[in-house]
Amino acid sequence: MGLVVKDISKTFGEKTSKTEVLKDINFEVKDGEFIILNGASGSGKTTLLTILGGLLSQTSGDVVYEGKSLFERHTNKAHLRLNDIGFIFQASHLVPYLKVLDQLTLIGKETGMSSKEAQARAKELLTKIGLEEQLNSYPHMLSGGQQQRVAIMRALMNHPKIVLADEPTASLDASRAQEVVEMIRKQIKANQMIGIMITHDESLFKYADRIVQLYDGKIKNS
């Protein structure tokens, strides 16, 4: 059924100092589809992504997933983020004192997996990205590209229905950036998830099924 963004608007401030950042945003993303959000700085991309992830409330409109408001699927937005959504950010944000395996098993346990289930799932994901020999390594022992690959698998640990990525390759060189985005796309396709990524790097557009352009808080094309 996919994800339907319906008339999402966001205004900051009050009375005379109001700023409308998003203006009646409408688009759909099908299951298994990977789209890129693009637009100049200040066009509303990150604001939109944070609303989709339940990190920020919209002023009006709704986001519908599987026929129901995304924000009503759980008792609170923390449960939404933990169970339905996987986040990938510009920086990996790995916990410095946790080993690679533990970075993932921690998420699994928080979503209700047993220790055995979480370890099995984490090892499966880390093997997919060729890091099965680094399970007991700490983040500082990995390259930047390896750290970001761990962050991607961490985002997929809870079998999310939706993956949101905000400039996940901004700190990587061109070859690593291509590798990371190809990996994100591959996982979205294989698991029929919904993928939405923000990037300014036009060389990465080829990995998207569709580009959604934002301009001044509005959809320019989709």
UniProtKB/Swiss-Prot annotation:
Signal peptide: none annotated. Pfam families: ABC_tran. GO terms for cellular component: plasma membrane. Residues 3-222 form the ABC transporter domain. Its main location: membrane. ATP binds at G39, A40, S41, G42, S43, G44, K45, T46. It comes from the Bacteria. Keywords: ATP-binding, Cell membrane, Membrane, Nucleotide-binding, Translocase, Transport. It is found in: Cell membrane. One of its GO terms (molecular function) is transmembrane transporter activity. Its EC number is 7.6.2.-. It is a peripheral membrane protein. Belongs to the ABC transporter superfamily. HrtA family. The complex is composed of two ATP-binding proteins (HrtA), two transmembrane proteins (HrtB) and a solute-binding protein. Part of the ABC transporter complex hrt involved in hemin import. Responsible for energy coupling to the transport system. This is Putative hemin import ATP-binding protein HrtA. It comes from Staphylococcus epidermidis (strain ATCC 35984 / DSM 28319 / BCRC 17069 / CCUG 31568 / BM 3577 / RP62A).
